[in-house]
């Protein structure tokens, strides 16, 4: 609650505290004068000289002349810097009877905002003659009236003021009367007729005089009225009022017909000579707001009163008896001010569009006024509390509306401000004026991407100019400051040919692949994109784009072993005594793709004899499916299909030649089994090693013996033991010697040994027979018994 009161005090400015902030205005008010009715365009003053400004400063700072009510009595010539009359001025219309007639105005300069107080005095010329309300006045005077008796006459009116106004009255030459010029309290002059010599009805029953009103102009102007005087018979008594001066106070909002006051007069005569009737004297039918009842003397309102126009009235009341004699009294009616006028607000300067980020800007300059008086004239100016604006008093009744601090268009782009002017009368009256202030944009926000990094995917073998994705950035500014242009930034990797890989649409951020991408050559790359606005200076930001090339199944499996290059296929030897599951060979293949496109599966596509051999689907091992017999053919041709897991799948085939050999014993290569239990005793490991060494020695001796016997019996055999005879060249870099299970040209087998006591696992040694010449005769082989019987182990 306390905080709200403090804010209200900050926002409200009492009009009656007239703070003269001379830091913003000139230290003195400059005064100019001009005669009324002067032609428009007449030179009044040179502002540059009078204000002490540099030449051209008035025009560059948008000088303006501001009068109350936005009436333009003067105009500013931006070329000559002269102040000229904008129209003919009528002093009587502008100020009435008020003298001097001064019109205050302000010279308003912008950039920065500055006030200069000035005033224009309109001097009167004698353009009006005095004028009586009636061309003829009637007076009835008893012949027994003593000399020195004064008879008030109706006054003349002159719209001019000062020396040009009404100055005196004269009367035509006569022996009975002279005229006096009297002053009223408000300064107006009225005539009084003074009797100098007694009247005689029998001698002259009627007189006609001319009353002349003269002003002080040069030459003087005058007005006349005829006075007709009727001399009456003896009548001892004239009507007399109870008071010579009556006073009344009337609120300005009294209704029409309401009673103002009642005057009364009596006549001591009897009969018709004692009957009194009332009338208003010095009646101005245009401005007179009162009427009187001729019988009762009640004075009532016939027109509405307005304190702001006339604050008091001087009324003369005349009482006339039946004999024509009259008496007069004066009535002063003071009009009481009522708070019947709401404050007025006049906007002199207003900027509807203000830039953001400036600490303090003058938005509007306005003046306030209230036609009431006293307490009813005091006003308070205020705006809403929740706005970043302040009201500051300027000069006299002027106020400036300024920003409280820098505004942010992105937070709020428009403000509706209601200026409230409230007077302190009872009841309080107020005036409101709403203005709309829009905040113009300044380029203070860089574009912001919707994501700090983008990940895009494109499948390889794409068509050139393919739209692969988009980046998007927004700018909180508006207009041209919010227009974003996209670009590719130089890559951090100098070897990345970014300009030949992708491009970006500068207007919408769409990204395009410029050429077909190959996953096998380039799986992914990163680059940066920039977003720049079109403000001045331009602001920018950047984002990281990661492009991932998706693999397409565009590579068929490639068979490494056995070699499928069009040369003569190699032959695998299998002893007829081989057990089911005997490893014949292993098809080794690779796929240049990745992921599931590189997952290979194997299957036996063709075989000379179905059911004799089988292919493991996942590793390509070719094994015997059953026991061999003498009835099985000696030569077999197997076609193994290698297929990837792509969509659609791609495949390749490998052709194998298998030769069944009688009486040739080979070590049984069992299927992979689970490792022995870890809990076996260490002593068992020692026994297994000794047993394995004995069996291996016996097995090696048996093999050598078997090979020697077979070579003797089969002179046409081209090789001894289990080996592959390549009938064509086989590239050395494709031989699998890493223990993957692929059979090379040399015959391979594994000897199972146990490891250390810690593992209780078997290890396998791989004796490898050196390659034999692809062609040879039994005689040549007999000449090299070392080759036949040598089985080096590695």
Swiss-Prot record:
Disulfide topology: 95-101
Domain of life: Eukaryota
Parts of the chain on the Cytoplasmic side: 710-794
Topology of the protein relative to the lipid bilayer: Single-pass type I membrane protein
Keyword Membrane carried by entry: yes
PROSITE patterns recorded: CADHERIN_1, CADHERIN_2
A cellular component annotation (GO) from this entry: synapse
GO biological process, one term: chemical synaptic transmission
Main location: membrane
Location of the protein in the cell: Cell membrane
Signal peptide, first to last residue: 1-27
Span list, region Disordered: 773-794
Keyword tags: Calcium, Cell adhesion, Cell membrane, Disulfide bond, Glycoprotein, Membrane, Metal-binding, Repeat, Signal, Transmembrane, Transmembrane helix
Residues covered by the Cadherin domain: 34-132, 137-241, 246-345, 350-449, 454-559, 566-669
Matches recorded under InterPro entries: Cadherin-like_dom, Cadherin-like_sf, Cadherin_C, Cadherin_CS, Cadherin_N, Protocadherin/Cadherin-CA
One Pfam family named in its UniProt record: Cadherin_2
CDD domains reported for this sequence: Cadherin_repeat (cd11304)
GO molecular-function term, one example from the UniProt record: identical protein binding
Domain text: Cadherin 1 to cadherin 4 domains mediate homophilic trans-interaction, the interaction with an identical protocadherin expressed by a neighboring cell. This is a head-to-tail interaction, the cadherin 1 domain interacting with the cadherin 4 domain and the cadherin 2 domain interacting the cadherin 3 domain of the other protocadherin. The cadherin 6 domain mediates promiscuous interactions with protocadherins on the same cell membrane. Each cadherin domain binds three calcium ions.
Function: Calcium-dependent cell-adhesion protein involved in cells self-recognition and non-self discrimination. Thereby, it is involved in the establishment and maintenance of specific neuronal connections in the brain.
Protein's UniProt name: Protocadherin beta-6
């Amino acid at each position: 609650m306390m905080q709200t009161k403090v804010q209200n005090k900050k926002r409200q400015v009492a009009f009656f505290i007239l703070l003269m902030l001379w830091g913003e205005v000139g230290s003195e008010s400059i005064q100019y004068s001009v005669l009324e009715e002067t032609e428009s365009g007449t030179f009044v003053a040179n502002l540059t000289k009078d204000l002490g400004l540099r030449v051209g400063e008035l025009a560059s700072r948008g000088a303006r002349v501001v009068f109350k009510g936005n009436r333009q009595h003067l105009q500013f010539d931006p070329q000559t810097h002269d102040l000229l009359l904008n129209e003919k001025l009528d002093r009587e219309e502008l100020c009435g009877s008020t003298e001097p007639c001064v019109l205050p105005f302000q010279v308003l300069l912008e950039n920065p905002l500055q006030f200069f107080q000035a005033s224009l005095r309109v001097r009167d010329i004698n353009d009006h003659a005095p004028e009586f309300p009636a061309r003829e006045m009637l007076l009835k005077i008893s012949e027994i009236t003593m000399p020195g008796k004064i008879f008030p006459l109706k006054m003349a009116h002159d719209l001019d003021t000062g020396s040009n106004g009404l100055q005196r009255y004269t009367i035509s030459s006569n022996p009975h009367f002279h005229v006096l010029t009297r002053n009223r309290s408000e300064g107006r002059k009225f005539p009084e007729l003074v009797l100098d010599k007694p009247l005689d009805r029998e001698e002259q029953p009627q007189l006609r005089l001319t009353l002349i009103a003269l002003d002080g102009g040069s030459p003087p102007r005058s007005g006349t009225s005829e006075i007709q005087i009727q001399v009456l018979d003896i009548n001892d008594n004239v009507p007399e009022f109870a008071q010579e001066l009556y006073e009344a106070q009337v609120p300005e909002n009294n209704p029409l017909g309401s009673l103002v006051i009642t005057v009364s007069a009596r006549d001591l005569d009897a009969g018709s000579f004692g009957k009194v009737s009332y009338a208003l004297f010095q009646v101005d039918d245009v401005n007179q707001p009162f009427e009187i009842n001729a019988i009762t003397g009640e004075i009532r309102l016939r027109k509405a009163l307005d304190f702001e126009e006339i604050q008091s009235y001087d009324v003369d009341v005349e009482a006339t008896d039946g004999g024509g004699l009259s008496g007069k009294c004066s009535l002063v009616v003071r009009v009481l001010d009522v708070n019947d006028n709401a404050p007025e607000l006049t906007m002199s300067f207003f900027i509807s569009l203000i830039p953001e980020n400036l600490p303090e800007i003058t938005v509007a300059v306005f003046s306030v006024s209230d036609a009431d008086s006293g307490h009813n004239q005091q006003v308070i100016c205020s705006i809403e509390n929740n706005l970043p604006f302040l009201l500051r008093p300027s000069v006299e009744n002027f106020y400036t509306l300024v920003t409280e601090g820098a505004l942010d268009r992105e937070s709020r782009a428009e403000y509706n401000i209601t200026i409230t002017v409230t007077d302190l009368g009872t009841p309080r009256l107020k005036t409101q004026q709403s203005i709309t202030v829009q905040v113009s944009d300044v380029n203070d926000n860089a574009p912001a991407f919707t994501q700090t990094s983008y990940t895009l995917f494109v499948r390889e073998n794409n068509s050139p100019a393919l739209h692969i994705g988009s980046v998007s950035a927004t700018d909180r500014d508006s207009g041209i400051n919010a227009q974003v242009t996209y670009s590719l930034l130089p890559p951090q990797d100098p070897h990345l040919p970014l300009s030949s890989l992708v491009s970006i649409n500068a207007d919408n951020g769409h990204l395009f692949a410029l050429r077909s991408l190959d996953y096998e050559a380039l799986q992914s790359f990163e680059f940066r994109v920039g977003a720049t606005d079109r403000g001045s200076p331009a602001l920018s930001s950047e984002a990281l784009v990661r492009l991932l090339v998706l693999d397409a199944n565009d590579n068929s499996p490639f068979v490494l072993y056995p070699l499928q290059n069009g040369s003569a296929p190699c032959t695998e030897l299998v002893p007829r005594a081989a057990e089911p599951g005997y490893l014949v060979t292993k098809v080794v293949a690779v796929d240049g793709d990745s992921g599931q496109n590189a997952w290979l599966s194997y299957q036996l596509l063709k075989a000379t004899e179905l059911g004799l051999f089988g292919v493991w689907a996942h590793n390509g091992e070719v094994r015997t499916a059953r026991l061999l017999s003498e009835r099985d053919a000696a030569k077999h041709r197997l076609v193994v299909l290698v297929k990837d897991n792509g969509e659609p799948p791609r495949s390749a085939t490998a052709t194998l030649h298998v030769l069944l050999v009688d009486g040739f014993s080979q070590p049984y290569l069992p299927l992979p089994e689970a490792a022995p239990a870890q809990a076996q005793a260490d002593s068992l490991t020692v026994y297994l090693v000794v047993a394995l060494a004995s069996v291996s020695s016996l097995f090696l001796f048996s093999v050598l013996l078997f090979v020697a016997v077979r070579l003797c019996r089969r002179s046409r055999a081209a090789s001894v033991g289990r080996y592959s005879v390549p009938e064509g060249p086989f590239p050395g870099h494709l031989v699998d010697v890493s223990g993957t299970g692929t059979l090379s040209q040399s015959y391979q087998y594994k000897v199972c040994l146990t490891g250390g006591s810690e593992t209780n696992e078997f290890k396998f040694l791989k004796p490898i027979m050196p390659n034999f010449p692809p062609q040879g005769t039994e005689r040549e082989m007999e000449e090299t018994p070392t080759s036949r019987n040598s089985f080096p182990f590695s």
